[in-house]
UniProtKB/Swiss-Prot annotation:
Residues 1-79 form a transit peptide. GO terms for biological process: ribosome disassembly. SMART domains: EFG_C (SM00838), EFG_IV (SM00889). It is found in: Plastid, Chloroplast. The gene is fusA2. GO terms for molecular function: GTP binding; GTPase activity; translation elongation factor activity. This is Elongation factor G-2, chloroplastic. Belongs to the TRAFAC class translation factor GTPase superfamily. Classic translation factor GTPase family. EF-G/EF-2 subfamily. It holds the Pfam family GTP_EFTU_D2. GTP binds at residues 100-107, 164-168, 218-221.
Length: 780
């Protein structure tokens, strides 16, 4: 808590780095003057046509800034001479993200954090379109977060780097790349809805990267709020072990504050000064028994992490407050449990204790294992980088953002070492050196120049030309390649064309920049039918892309009907012998190969394996076989969709001393693919979505009937407060286009739904035949 000795606590001050408190001061307009915009580099017409004619462009990150006034009131580094002097010890760094289902209150919570820490001078509201972190026009209009936004603030002498992430499933990539570079996370839950589908998705993403987290049950002021039901859902839906460290005092309109079980005190907000003041009082009498019960459960759980504390507890001696915090921190960082807190960000209650928990329980970079990578020259060799300024520099580029005044900005998490403006770094993935133009600390879409970045920092770099999302930047003399991120494949596509021929080049420029920012967005150009196709994670994702083309690149476009990204696979093993022979005077072409095609588990992708023995196919020709097969995997034999979950095994072959070549074996592999896949029982796969519909009970029958008509499979039913029913179903994506309009119509606008990709499954034969026929007609 910010001031433990005082019963009356005021918090709209920020901690200065020397330990004193200061009030925020209003910035003078003169502070914003003298900013000289730098022109961003544009692509030439020739380079545009080169890119536009390529089969696919896909790279990395976020959005284009509009506000350009740099914030000067937060200096990140104190400079001494020509070197950086760390003003905040690394142990006091917290790199955190805020993640949750859509509308759980992520951005609202972040806005309160920025206000109470003194970073902002007023509270921005999502519903008013004034939230600092939702700076894009589309975000302000729709009231949702589309791109992750980064900022830095301070609390109790700790530096907190925050990334606010989207909750909509279409923008799950933003959550993925944020969690990849964060040390801890706050997972928000709506106290009425509990654990929702996208909450489960982001929880699994955090599990994947081993991110310690704390839970905040938000919206305790809402009708139907139930802290204890949400706590139970954390167990049943997420398989996690919640450690309750706060209890609510009241709920709905009577929600007044929380019981802090660590200190065994109640924290009550009066509603004055936007929640900046609160009282620390004794636990109310009617809640003392319940508080003692949950406090005992908390202590019994945490003393398992310390033998002395356990021994004392068995002898009737409770650990003191400092020991309790230390043990909660230990269990949180080891992911043995997740602390659970509660509050109402919108009503300004519970946010300051949440900030205390970030400082007390979430890890600093020093609390986590050393970052592991590989040697670029020898990928089998593991290299470690410890979080220290004295280590060689190593950082991961996790986001690209276009800025109209600075150009392309590359967001980097610095894991080790120092980075200064004007220095050179090595892109270890590409083996290219890059020069750092400027180092910028970001606050949403405003920026401030800094001279040096140190271990633990999240910084934006200007001037990089060849680095994309997921690539490693490092000291040229000490190269290391860090683990890359996984990017989801698009599941939906639409055809798009500019309304006027004059906009062709402008649209190409826009698509290239948007694809560089967002690795989950792809586009391709089919010159034969003169059509451009854009691909993304859902209808909303592509709708935002088209809207950004219009607003940011001034391109009006005609958009076709959505189409599904199907896949092709095989159902059985087949072996084929293929001989490629061509003789037309001079040196001919000869390659003889035998390839076995085997089905693999769903989600396995493609795998090549060589079982050649005795030099039947020389080693120098095997790469030709690999390349030929890989080229074919993007164009299946049924309807031209990508082929997945197939293992190709080169088992035998022969060659000619004169006529054989890498090209000959590459062409032979193509022929073997066409024949072999047809023999292996080819089949088409379609994306199946997990759909959750929340509807009033009187419309339940209509909803179920409609889902059944869409080839849906009903999995389960559930209840929600207010007489609402929950339908959980699996439905093919092809049947879900424009579903929102249908659902609103049959329920008079009272139902809602969410959906996310669950799996790929076999397409029914009659639909497969229709798709194959359609592809043949297009080809003809």
């Amino acid at each position: 808590m910010a001031a433990e000795s005082s019963l009356r606590v005021a918090t709209p001050t920020i901690c200065n780095l020397n330990g004193s408190q200061r009030r925020p001061t209003t910035l003078s307009p003169l502070r914003f003057m003298g900013f000289s915009p730098r022109p961003s580099h544009s692509l030439t017409s020739s380079s545009l046509s080169h890119f536009f004619g390529s089969t696919r462009i896909n790279s990395n990150s976020s959005s284009i800034s509009r506000q350009h006034a740099p914030r000067r009131n937060f200096s990140v580094f104190a400079m001494s001479g020509d070197d950086a002097k760390r003003s905040v010890p690394l142990k006091d760094y917290r790199n955190i993200g805020i993640m949750a289902h859509i509308d759980a209150g992520k951005t609202t919570t972040t806005e309160r954090i920025l206000y109470y820490t003194g970073r902002n001078y007023k509270i921005g509201e999502v519903h008013e379109g004034t939230a600092t972190m939702d700076w894009m026009e589309q975000e302000q209009e729709r009231g949702i977060t589309i791109t992750s936004a980064a900022t830095t603030t301070f609390w109790n002498k700790h530096r907190i780097n925050i990334i606010d992430t989207p909750g909509h499933v279409d923008f799950t990539l933003e959550v993925e790349r944020a969690l990849r570079v964060l040390d801890g996370a706050i997972c928000l839950f709506d106290s009425v809805a509990g654990v929702e589908p996208q909450s489960e998705t982001v929880w699994r993403q955090a599990d994947k990267y081993g991110v310690p987290r704390i839970c905040f049950v938000n919206k305790m002021d809402r009708l139907g709020a139930n802290f204890y039901r949400t706590r139970d859902m954390i167990v049943t839906n997420l398989g996690a072990k919640p450690l309750v460290i706060q209890l609510p005092i009241g709920s709905e309109d009577n929600f007044k504050g929380v019981i802090d079980l660590v200190r065994n005190k109640a924290i009550v907000w009066s509603g004055e000064e936007l929640g900046a003041k609160f009282d620390i009082v004794d636990v109310p009498e009617d809640l003392q028994e319940q508080a003692q019960e949950y406090r005992a459960q908390m202590i019994e759980t945490i003393v398992e992490f310390d033998d002395q504390a356990m021994e004392n507890y068995l002898e009737g001696i409770e650990p003191d407050e400092e020991t309790i915090k230390k043990l909660i921190r230990k269990g949180t960082i080891s992911a043995s449990f997740v602390p659970v807190m509660c509050g109402s960000a919108f009503k300004n209650k519970g946010v300051q204790p949440l900030l205390d928990a970030v400082v007390d329980y979430l890890p600093s970079p020093l609390d986590l294992p050393a970052m592991k990578g590989s040697d670029p020259e020898n990928p089998e060799e593991t290299i470690e980088r410890v979080a220290s300024d004295d280590e060689p520099f190593a950082g991961l580029a996790f986001k690209i953002m276009s800025d109209p005044f600075v150009g392309s900005l590359t967001f980097v998490r610095v894991y080790a070492g120092k980075l200064s403006a004007g220095s050179y770094v090595l892109n270890a993935n590409k083996g290219k050196k890059e020069r750092i133009g400027r180092l910028l600390e970001m606050h949403a879409n405003s920026r401030e120049d800094v001279k040096v970045a140190l271990a633990g920092d999240i910084i934006a770099l200007a001037g990089l030309k060849d680095t994309i999302t997921g690539e490693t930047l490092c000291d040229p003399d000490n190269p290391i390649v860090l683990e890359r991120m996984d990017f989801p494949d698009p599941v939906i596509k639409v055809a798009i064309e500019p309304k006027t021929k004059a906009d062709v080049d402008k649209m190409a420029t826009g698509l290239i920049k948007l694809a560089q920012e967002d690795p989950s967005f792809h586009f391709s150009r089919d010159e034969e039918i003169n059509q451009t196709v854009i691909e993304g994670m859902g209808e909303l994702h592509l709708e935002i892309i088209v809207d950004r083309l219009k607003r940011e690149f001034k391109v009006e476009a005609n958009v076709g009907a959505p189409q599904v990204n199907y896949r092709e696979s095989i159902s059985k093993t087949a072996e084929v012998k293929y001989v490629h022979k061509k003789q037309s005077g001079g040196q001919g072409q000869f390659a003889d190969i035998t390839v076995r095609f085997e089905p693999m588990d769903p989600g396995s992708g493609y795998e090549f394996k060589s079982e050649i023995k005795g030099g039947a196919v020389p080693k120098e020709y095997i790469p030709g076989v690999m390349k030929g097969l890989e080229e074919c995997m993007s164009n299946g034999v049924l309807a031209g969709f990508p082929v997945v979950d197939v293992r190709a095994v080169l088992t035998d072959g022969s060659y000619h001393d004169v006529d054989s070549s890498v090209l000959a074996f590459q062409l032979a592999a193509r022929g073997a693919f066409r024949e072999g896949i047809r023999k292996a029982g080819p089949r088409m796969l379609e994306p199946i979505m997990k759909v959750e519909v929340v509807t009033p009970e009187e419309h339940l029958g209509d909803v179920i009937g409609d889902l059944n008509s869409r080839r849906g499979q009903i999995n389960s039913f559930g209840d929600k407060p207010g007489g609402l029913k929950v339908v959980d179903a699996l439905v093919p994506l092809a049947e879900m286009f424009q579903y929102v309009s249908t659902l609103r119509g049959m329920t008079k606008g009272r139902a809602s739904y969410t959906m996310q990709l669950a799996m790929f499954d076999v397409v029914p034969q009659h639909i497969q035949n229709q798709l194959a026929t359609k592809e043949q007609e297009v080809a003809a």
